Amino acid sequence: RIQDVNVQKSAENEPYSYFVDELTAQAIQELQDRLGYTKDKATDLLYSGGLTIYSTQDPSLQTIVDEEVNNPDNYDTAKHSVTWRYTLKHDDGSIVNYSEKDLIRWMKEVKGINFNGLFSSEESAKSYVDQYKAELVSETDKEMGEQFFTTLEPQVSFVLMDPHTGQVKAISGGRGEKRYSLSLNRATGTLRQPGSTFKLITSFAPAIDLYGATLATPFYDTAYTLGNKTFKNWYSSGFLGYQTIRDGIIYSLNIIAVRCLMEQLNPHEGRLYAENLGITSLVDGDENPALALGGITHGVTNLELTQAFATIANDGQFNKAKFFTKILDQEGNVLIDTTEDQPRQAMKDTTAFLLTDAMKQSMLPNRAYAASLNVNSTSTRAHFDGMSLAGKSGTTTKDVDIWFVGYSPY
């Protein structure tokens, strides 16, 4: 049994929460890593060995997260993407499988609809599926199976972590109904491009930490080409001339981040530095200038990015993200106690202080000194009064991914 309020299911068939899904996965992995169990033995022990597991979750905070993630007022729009699987058996014995890709192709090519893959409602999606099926099925065909469901868009994930302990207090793997246990958890199981959040952990942080740069170290913001790649800033046009690392953080300046990576250190060291902060998804092909902008092969998980920034919040001390504090066997003996884990100094405390100071300013209204350009600080939408805050935003091309990662001392 997992000893915590979040596991008490109101109905036998109710799926586990995202938190419990991740707690379960981490417990099985830790039983292997710390006690040398096989995966099968760890799994059997978890589900039928009478274990007691103490969660790190704060139920009151989890309730707030769930309410805010699912509050439609927090989103500019509400669309639905479709997952559809349909199998037909023809009278000649052949079997044909269809999916939402076939549906979308039919809508564009046959119906002539300029369609981006998102429906206005679940009912609208089902209506088009039914129309498509009517054209597919003959009297002699036999339906072998069908799966249909919609997913609210845009989707979201959220991680709330205590940076001093690594304990995860609340998590959300997505908005909308969670249909089954161990379903897709967008906070821990989905790799997304991190955008400008990576400027800190692959470029600015290692430059300060390893090479003695400061927030006042300048780089020249101008047209910048390396090989066949020309780098641009996120705003429309123009350049700011000499700008410091502090400016690069506050205004999220692409060229400053790339020049810092290439002129103060190198992409290999930038990758190693991110990995030292717990990023595990980088590959050799990521060792290029685009690393400074989060242009990487596979992306990162929300959990690992939160873990990396939690290191900055914790004066440079790294804690692995934890979903439980203790595991006890059926006799009450402690098998694992994560509260005894010691943090690892992953960056100098002075580096963490400087990065925090710059990220505080990125959340306040600031404007770059340039008469012909309107370049403002990039994280102001996450700011609220009454509390000291630090953080960094990140976006990718056409706003496919939008990030904010930040912290307070409370």
Segments from the language model and where they lie:
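Non-catalytic, structured segments within soluble enzyme domains
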Residues: 1-100, 275, 280-281, 290-294
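Conserved catalytic neighborhood of penicillin-recognizing serine enzymes
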Residues: 9-13, 212-270, 330-356, 360-361
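Soluble non-cytosolic domains of exported or imported proteins
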Residues: 13-22, 55-63, 178-179, 192-197, ...
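Flexible glycine/proline-enriched surface loops and loop-helix/loop-strand junctions
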Residues: 46-51, 182-189, 231, 240-242, ...
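A penicillin-recognizing enzyme superfamily signal
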Residues: 55-75, 82-90, 95-150, 154-162, ...
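Active-site SXXK
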Residues: 65, 165-166, 192-219, 248, ...
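Short active-site loop at a secondary-structure junction
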Residues: 151-157, 179-201, 216-219, 290
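Mid-domain, small-residue-enriched loop/turn segments at the edges of structured enzyme/sensor domains
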Residues: 230-232, 264-307
